């Protein structure tokens, strides 16, 4: 094999029954505000939408972020619970 060639590694297939990962506070914010940003800026690219959402998130005060952080905490607890149940089910 030539020194510039890379070995192909096969990725482990994801189990469709595995619990979905928890969302971060930013992701809850982005999901809630994505359509608003698109409506305010028609015709912008997907990347630009993300950039504007990031700027809006950074501009929020810590108090404004609290509802999103609470949602993220709740979702994290859900994920941990589902992950434990999934691990218990698949260990047997």
Curated annotation (Swiss-Prot):
InterPro entries: HMG_box_dom (IPR009071), HMG_box_dom_sf (IPR036910), HMGB (IPR050342). Its main location: nucleus. PROSITE patterns: HMG_BOX_2. One of its GO terms (biological process) is DNA repair. SMART domains: HMG. Residues 19-87 bind DNA. CDD domains: HMG-box_NHP6-like. One of its GO terms (molecular function) is DNA binding. Keywords: Chromosome, DNA damage, DNA repair, DNA-binding, Nucleus, Transcription, Transcription regulation. Residues 1-21, 63-92 are annotated as: Disordered. It is found in: Nucleus; Chromosome. One of its GO terms (cellular component) is chromosome. DNA-binding protein that induces severe bending of DNA. Required for DNA-binding by the FACT complex, a general chromatin factor that acts to reorganize nucleosomes. The FACT complex is involved in multiple processes that require DNA as a template such as mRNA elongation, DNA replication and DNA repair. Also augments the fidelity of transcription by RNA polymerase III independently of any role in the FACT complex. Weakly associates with the stable SPT16-POB3 heterodimer to form the FACT complex. Belongs to the NHP6 family. This is Non-histone chromosomal protein 6.
């Amino acid at each position: 094999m030539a020194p510039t060639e890379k070995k192909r590694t096969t990725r482990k297939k994801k189990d469709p029954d595995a619990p979905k990962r928890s969302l971060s506070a930013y992701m809850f914010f982005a999901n809630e505000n994505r359509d608003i940003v698109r409506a305010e800026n028609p015709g912008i690219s997907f990347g630009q939408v993300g950039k504007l959402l990031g700027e809006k998130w950074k501009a929020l005060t810590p108090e404004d972020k609290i509802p999103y952080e609470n949602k993220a905490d709740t979702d994290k607890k859900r994920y941990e619970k589902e992950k434990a149940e999934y691990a218990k089910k698949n260990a047997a």
